[in-house]
Amino acid sequence: MELAEIEELMNKAVQATQRSFNTVRTGRANSSLLDRIQVEYYGVPTPLKALASLTTPDSSTLLIQPFDPSTLAAIERAIVASDLGLTPSNDGKVVRLTIPPLTEERRKELSKQVAKLAEEGRVSIRNIRRDGIDSVRKREKNGELSEDESKSLQDDIQKLTDRYIKKIDELLAEKEKELTTL
């Protein structure tokens, strides 16, 4: 494993954590809230975005306009079954989601959820570090690297790890601030 490859993998882990954070509801309407919603469409779980157009007419409303009106009920069921805690209303043409202001209790729940997502991101980065260091040690054992080169590469990998974990911590702080700001 080369250093550039390790850095790319760590960057992808940070991006995945960011995407996970985007699916956590903060009290403002945002179509990325619905990214994880899978709708049963002819027996196949299908991403909601593939079945409908999503718009945000104002800061507290999401409109879901299905391309096929027969999917309205399935879309509603998928939203109710999700962990978003939102109640959809259906007028026969569109599904309307009104995002209520977050209660203090719900904010705390979401903060815990976000902290868990951040920890998953950190674990992912640490696993990449472990794989990278194992690769360096293996190359040293095979005689491809000197002991000094190996130590230097391991230090570089640790610096990358620290940098990317710091990025996840910054994303976490930003998201928690977003959750606590009314």
Curated annotation (Swiss-Prot):
<comment type="function">
    <text>Responsible for the release of ribosomes from messenger RNA at the termination of protein biosynthesis. May increase the efficiency of translation by recycling ribosomes from one round of translation to another.</text>
</comment>
<dbReference type="GO" id="GO:0043023">
    <property type="term" value="F:ribosomal large subunit binding"/>
</dbReference>
<dbReference type="InterPro" id="IPR036191">
    <property type="entry name" value="RRF_sf"/>
</dbReference>
<dbReference type="Pfam" id="PF01765">
    <property type="entry name" value="RRF"/>
</dbReference>
<dbReference type="GO" id="GO:0005737">
    <property type="term" value="C:cytoplasm"/>
</dbReference>
<keyword id="KW-0648">Protein biosynthesis</keyword>
<comment type="similarity">
    <text>Belongs to the RRF family.</text>
</comment>
<dbReference type="GO" id="GO:0006415">
    <property type="term" value="P:translational termination"/>
</dbReference>
<dbReference type="InterPro" id="IPR002661">
    <property type="entry name" value="Ribosome_recyc_fac"/>
</dbReference>
<keyword id="KW-0963">Cytoplasm</keyword>
<dbReference type="InterPro" id="IPR023584">
    <property type="entry name" value="Ribosome_recyc_fac_dom"/>
</dbReference>
<protein>
    <recommendedName>
        <fullName>Ribosome-recycling factor</fullName>
    </recommendedName>
</protein>
